[in-house]
């Protein structure tokens, strides 16, 4: 197996998803003092309820021949009692743990339409969420002043440079809440890939913080706030497919323009493409002149093909990482009958082959591409008021050529 630190994942302890009914039911044969450490916030105390309120089942029994009186049998129904208490915990104690999928995106096309006075560039792009993603586990910290942040890969910043931390700080600033979290980031999306993995993490953190706070902000609020810390973050508050303009923060939801079962393969060499370097080498007089709305219409009517997958950042990215140009050319040549289109996502360095989940055979041959990252993926979307779900039918685990048989 290749020794790339970004793709060797350590085993870690997973937080069990919390289900209060099963938690309480596990104590069916136990005694009440085992609940004594549970002190939920709110107007009432569940411990008092445990001690004072009881649920009984009253059953009529046959008359006693010795007394001639009818008897009543009183049965204490512990299981029913605990189920009702569990429901009250869910209502009054709120969420304590939450695990969310944090998917990445690709740019099906990316036009750069001009440079702004603030130094940023205007773009027009079809963004789409795909099924490769990270998992983030949030646990509510008992402290109102600090939390913790760990991840399974080296090199990921664990301080305020990380977009997750920036997002949570932003949420506290905007809402006045004081909740902090223990966070475990299970990273599968490579960094420096043009896939928006960090932006997705930030959007997921904002969503999680809002859930822990009783959804005090709207999705529109979260989307608008997120633009303050990253241009790509607002997109993830769309439903998964969007036409994005401005710096990327102007997001227009569109109906999914491509089938969600359309397969693709993502291939990324070890070299990253620093976004700043790519934009420095961008020459606007050498970009495409095709109207991005024409590209969007063509995709909506005819699907993905090579002629619509325009990316104005490819030429400068190929200058920054020359081997990336060769990789794209080889994939396109080898996969003429395999892929509908081959293109770079974002500012690189991921090359996307749409139409097949398999990489071309040459990546298995020799040592040149022994450390390449590749993963299959599909297009996904989300429903209103729900976060993205990890598809169950697709294996998005990153792979290495030398791992194949």
Curated annotation (Swiss-Prot):
HAMAP family per the UniProt record, alphabetical: IspE
MF term (GO), any: ATP binding
Reaction(s) this enzyme catalyzes, per UniProt: 4-CDP-2-C-methyl-D-erythritol + ATP = 4-CDP-2-C-methyl-D-erythritol 2-phosphate + ADP + H(+)
Broad enzyme group: transferase
Homology family: Belongs to the GHMP kinase family. IspE subfamily.
Pathway(s) the chain acts in: Isoprenoid biosynthesis; isopentenyl diphosphate biosynthesis via DXP pathway; isopentenyl diphosphate from 1-deoxy-D-xylulose 5-phosphate: step 3/6
Chloroplast recorded as keyword: yes
An example Gene Ontology CC term for this record: chloroplast
Plastid in keyword set: yes
N-terminal signal peptide: none
Compartments, record wording: Plastid, Chloroplast
Sites where the protein binds ATP: 190-200
Gene: ISPE
Name under which the protein is recorded: 4-diphosphocytidyl-2-C-methyl-D-erythritol kinase, chloroplastic
InterPro entries hit by this protein: GHMP_kinase_C_dom, GHMP_kinase_C_sf, GHMP_kinase_N_dom, IspE, Ribosomal_Su5_D2-typ_SF, Ribsml_uS5_D2-typ_fold_subgr
Feature: transit peptide: 1-97
Organism: Mentha piperita (Peppermint)
Cited function: Catalyzes the phosphorylation of the position 2 hydroxy group of 4-diphosphocytidyl-2C-methyl-D-erythritol.
Primary residence: plastid
Single GO BP term: isopentenyl diphosphate biosynthetic process, methylerythritol 4-phosphate pathway
Keywords in alphabetical order: ATP-binding, Chloroplast, Isoprene biosynthesis, Kinase, Nucleotide-binding, Plastid, Transferase, Transit peptide
Pfam families the UniProt entry points to: GHMP_kinases_C, GHMP_kinases_N
Record lineage: Eukaryota, Viridiplantae, Streptophyta, Embryophyta, Tracheophyta
Coiled coil: none
Highest taxon of the lineage: Eukaryota
EC number from the UniProt entry: 2.7.1.148
């Amino acid at each position: 197996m290749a020794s790339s630190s970004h793709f060797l994942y350590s085993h870690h302890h997973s937080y069990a998803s919390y289900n209060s009914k099963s938690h309480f039911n596990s104590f069916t044969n136990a005694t009440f003092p085992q609940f004594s450490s549970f002190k939920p916030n709110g107007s009432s105390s569940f411990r008092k309820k445990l001690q004072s309120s009881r649920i009984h089942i009253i059953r009529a029994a046959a008359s006693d021949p010795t007394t001639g009186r009818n008897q009543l049998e009183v049965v204490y129904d512990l299981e029913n009692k605990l189920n009702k208490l569990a429901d009250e915990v869910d209502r009054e104690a709120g969420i304590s743990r939450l695990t969310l999928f944090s998917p990445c995106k690709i740019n099906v096309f990316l036009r750069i339409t001009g440079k702004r006075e603030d130094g940023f560039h205007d773009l027009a792009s079809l963004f789409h969420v795909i099924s490769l993603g990270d998992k983030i586990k949030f646990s509510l910290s008992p402290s109102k002043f600090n939390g913790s942040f760990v991840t399974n890969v080296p090199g990921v910043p664990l301080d305020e440079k990380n977009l997750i931390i920036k997002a949570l700080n932003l949420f506290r600033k905007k809402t006045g809440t004081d909740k902090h979290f223990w966070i475990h980031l299970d990273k599968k999306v490579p960094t420096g890939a043009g896939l928006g993995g960090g932006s997705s993490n930030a959007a997921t953190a904002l969503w999680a913080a809002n859930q822990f706070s009783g959804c005090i902000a709207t999705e529109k609020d979260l989307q608008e706030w997120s633009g303050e810390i990253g241009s790509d973050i607002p997109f993830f508050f769309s439903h998964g497919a969007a036409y994005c303009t401005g710096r990327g923060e102007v997001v227009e939801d569109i109906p999914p323009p491509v089938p969600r079962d359309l397969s693709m393969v993502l291939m990324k060499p070890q070299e990253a493409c620093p976004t700043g370097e790519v934009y420095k080498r961008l020459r606007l007089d050498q970009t495409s002149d095709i109207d991005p709305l024409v590209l969007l219409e063509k995709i909506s009517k005819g699907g993905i093909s090579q002629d619509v997958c325009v990316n104005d950042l490819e030429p400068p990215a190929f200058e920054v990482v020359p081997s990336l140009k060769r990789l794209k050319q080889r994939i396109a040549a080898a996969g003429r009958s395999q892929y509908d289109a081959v293109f770079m996502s974002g500012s690189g360095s991921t090359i996307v082959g749409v139409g097949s989940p398999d990489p071309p055979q040459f990546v298995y041959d020799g040592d040149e591409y022994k450390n390449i990252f590749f993963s299959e993926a599909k297009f996904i979307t989300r429903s209103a008021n729900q976060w993205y779900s990890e598809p169950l039918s697709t294996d998005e685990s990153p792979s290495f050529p030398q791992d194949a048989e």
